[in-house]
Amino acid sequence: GNETLDKAIVLDQAENTAVTGFVINGGCNYGVYVKNSSSFYLADLDISNVSLKGLCVMGENTGFALVNNSIHENQNGAIFLNGEISNGVIEGNRIENNSGARNLTAGLVLCSMPIEDIETAYNPFPDEMLYDILQSPHQLVVRGNTVAQNHSSGIYSESGYLNYYVENTIYKNEKEGMCLDYGSFGNYITGCEIRQNGGRNRMSDEDLEADFILDQGRMADGSSPAKLPGISLDNTAYNTIYGNIVRDNYGSGIKAVRSAFSNTILCNQIIDNNRGASDTFHFFGIEL
């Protein structure tokens, strides 16, 4: 029939479980939805055209691998991790052309929002102090993924800590290539190529208003002049950005926003950023 299934595949308090080789093409709100599980393996999945998010991991989860999946053309984000999530590997995935222009609809999202209803990835965002955030994704290895042409950021970390981002290729995302935000700390980014991000080319007036930049107008090509960097450090601390290639981004290469404390940026190739310079804005290699 024409009815939309809420979730195509659900793992609920699962242990020692593998899900491999499925193709999910539309017909549901969420492709794969994992809740409070451990020792699970999701591999070689192709998830596209779902109404909301392709793959969600919610609640308390540990000891898992998301490997060689293709998450593409979904309508409101791709991979979404929310909760006390640890000791996992996210490797070799292709995360491409997913819609949704808000921060929490990035290609890969790590966040710490309190989960009032575990059946939805849209719990209300609280107004809370950073020191009250006690459950967020940590001790994850995010390696060798391609994150490209998403309508929001490539990777968005909201309070994630002690995570390792290694050898990822992150390009042509409409917002930042990577954003470490809202108390993210102690993360390590190395060997990544982060290029051609931050153009804000495909955003509606509603999207720009939500980011408080609609009043900046639009450039001749229809994009917003308020371009974004390859890597944004926003209310974050003790991160290491080492040995990456950060090039051809529309805003700055690496930008520290609001509070950015005791971060280490070294041995990176930061080349030909500021592609979106205009009469209104000029950007830099490293902007503090």
Label for each model-derived stretch:
Residues G1-F40, K53-E60, L81-G83, L233:
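Extracellular beta-strand-rich solenoid/capping regions of secreted or surface-exposed proteins
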Residues D6-V10, Y30-Y33, K53-C56, G77-A78, ...:
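Structural detector of coil-to-beta-strand junctions
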Residues E15-N16, S37-Y41, E60-G63, E84-N87, ...:
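Short "repeat-start/strand-capping" segments in structured domains, especially the N-termini
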Residues T169, C179-G183, P229-G230:
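Core solenoid repeat modules with strong leucine/isoleucine-rich periodicity
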Residues A101-N103, C111-H138, G199-L228, G276-F283:
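Intrinsically disordered, low-complexity Ser/Thr- and acidic-rich flexible linkers and loops
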Residues E73-V142, N150-S153, E158:
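Solenoidal tandem-repeat scaffolds enriched in leucines and small polar residues
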Residues T264-Q269, H282, I286-L288:
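Predominantly extracellular beta-rich ligand-binding scaffolds that present long acidic/polar faces
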